[in-house]
Structures are given as C-alpha cells and as structure tokens.
C-alpha cells in the first residue's frame, strides 16, 4: 500500500482520507437520488430547478452541500433529465355566430386575488377517445379555483368549473374579470348568463393566437408534462388522476412566478407574492418521458 501511495505522491493517511471522502460523496448522491425519486412520485415532471427548490430543507437537514448545477449533473449522469415532445389537438371552436366579447386584459396586471380569472379547456385521452378538462385559474395566485372533467365538449363542463370557482370565491363587491378564448362553450348562453348573474366582467381573446390566453394554456402544459395526464384506459382512472394532479398543483408544486411558493400559499396571502404576470408569453405543449429505475450513485 505504501509503495502504491508513493507512486501517486500520497501518504497512506491521505489515500484513506480521499477514499472516505469519495464514499461519503457517493452516499450523499444516493440519498439525493432517493429524494428525487420520492418527489417525482408526487409530481413526475419536476425539472432540475423545481427539484432544487423543493429539496432545500431536505439538503440542510442531511447537511448536504449541493448547488443546482451539481444537481443537474447528477440527474444527467443517472438519465433523469426530462425530455419533451409536442402534442396538441384543437379544442377551440370559434367559428360560430354567438356574441364574442373584447379583450379586457391586454394591459391588466392583477394586484391581488379575485381580480382576474383565466379559463380554458383541453383534452385528455381516455381509451380510444377523449375526455375534456375545464379549468379556471386565479391569475394572481395561479391557484386553480374551479375545474370539471367531462366526457363531451358540451358547455356543461365549463359551467361546472365556473360553479366551483364561484362557490370558492364567495360573495364580494370586488370587480372580477373572467378571460377565456372565443370558443362556443364560453360564448354559450348558459355560460355567459351565469357570468352576468354573478356580475363578472367578460373578456375574450380577439384572435386565434393562444398567447392571448397564455396563463390558462400554460396550466394544461404543466398538468400534462409534470403530472403526465396524457392517457388512461378508463374515465374513472382519468378523473382520479386529474383530481390528484390539481390538488398537488395547488398545494405542492412551486411556481417560479411566485418566488417558488405554491398557489395555495399565494392565494392565502402567505409568503412571497407574485410580482410578474406575462399575459402574452409564448407557451407550447409537450410530452415527457421519465425513467428512474436504475439509479447510479456517482459522487456529487
């Protein structure tokens, strides 16, 4: 051993110290990867940045010093970097004779909850067909305040989501704007009448550009990419997955625009409050492939 150490200009003590250090780093890597796997069981599509933010308390409690770049390297070594591909089916039918409303939110920047709701509808594959998820989100807190999962594209789905949002919102004298695309569901008599009854100002996109309703579009990108709401063999399984995903989206998933706080905390006025809102930021849909079976415990 002394001859071997001498070849590298090391003392026996230095060699043992280096070996112990490598063993410690390998053990820490295993701990980190185990926590990554646990978090991705809750939100399968968590990327490096959100994982890093969620793991701060965990790293501190285990006395592990790990930066975001090193975490990214560890994920890459173990094949845990997420990849995406585009996938989108048109669900907006704006070619109709129903009354359309002007865009009221082009320059609007909400300063609190209950000022602006954004709404949209998207598909989820069920069996050989599709079911449709309607959501309403508070633009300030990013909290999904209403949702409905429906087997058809009828207005019943969006109306049910609206009723849930109204029940959560309660009675208030504060002015509220509801923004959506110009699809036939949101222009229908049942939906418009309910908004008017609740004294909510109606706002709609003025073109087919999805960037005019970017916040609502982004919700579906997140739900599909990070919670893997792509396809299910039955409506019941899909509905259960949707409910679990929305609950986790509101209570567990950190948002960059909220200072990496959750929508629930922002909606309750706790912690960091939103400072930025980008109504026309471009979004895209995509798929996520994730494999985390064989973890390599390379040193951090």
Residues of each region from the PLM?
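Basic, flexible linker segments flanking DNA-binding modules
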Residues: 5, 9-113, 267-271, 276
């Amino acid at each position: 051993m002394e001859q071997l150490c001498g070849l590298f200009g090391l003392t026996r003590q230095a060699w043992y110290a280096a070996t112990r250090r490598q063993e410690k780093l390998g053990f820490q890597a295993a701990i980190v990867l185990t926590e990554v796997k646990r978090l991705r069981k809750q939100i399968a599509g968590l990327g490096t940045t959100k994982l890093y933010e969620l793991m701060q308390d965990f790293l501190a409690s285990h006395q592990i010093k790990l930066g975001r770049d090193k975490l990214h390297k560890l994920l890459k070594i173990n094949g845990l970097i997420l990849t995406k591909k585009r996938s989108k089916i048109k669900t907006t039918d704006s070619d109709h004779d129903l009354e359309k409303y002007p865009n009221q939110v082009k320059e609007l920047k909400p300063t609190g909850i209950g000022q602006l709701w954004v709404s949209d509808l998207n598909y989820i594959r069920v069996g050989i067909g599709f079911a449709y998820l309607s959501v309403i989100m508070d633009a300030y807190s990013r909290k999904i305040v209403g949702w409905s999962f429906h087997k058809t594209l009828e207005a019943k789905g969006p109306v049910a989501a609206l009723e849930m949002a109204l029940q959560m919102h309660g009675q208030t004298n504060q002015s509220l704007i509801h923004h959506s695309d110009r699809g036939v569901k949101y222009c229908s008599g049942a939906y418009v009448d309910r908004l008017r009854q609740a004294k909510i100002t109606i706002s709609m996109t003025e073109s087919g550009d999805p960037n005019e309703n970017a916040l609502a579009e982004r919700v579906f990108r997140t739900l599909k990419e990070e919670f893997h709401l792509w396809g299910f063999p039955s409506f019941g399984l899909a509905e259960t997955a949707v409910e679990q995903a929305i609950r986790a989206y509101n209570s567990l998933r950190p948002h960059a625009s909220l200072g990496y706080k959750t929508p629930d905390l922002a909606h309750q006025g706790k912690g960091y409050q939103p400072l930025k809102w980008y109504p026309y930021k471009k979004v895209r849909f995509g798929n996520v492939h994730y494999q985390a079976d064989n973890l390599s415990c390379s040193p951090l």
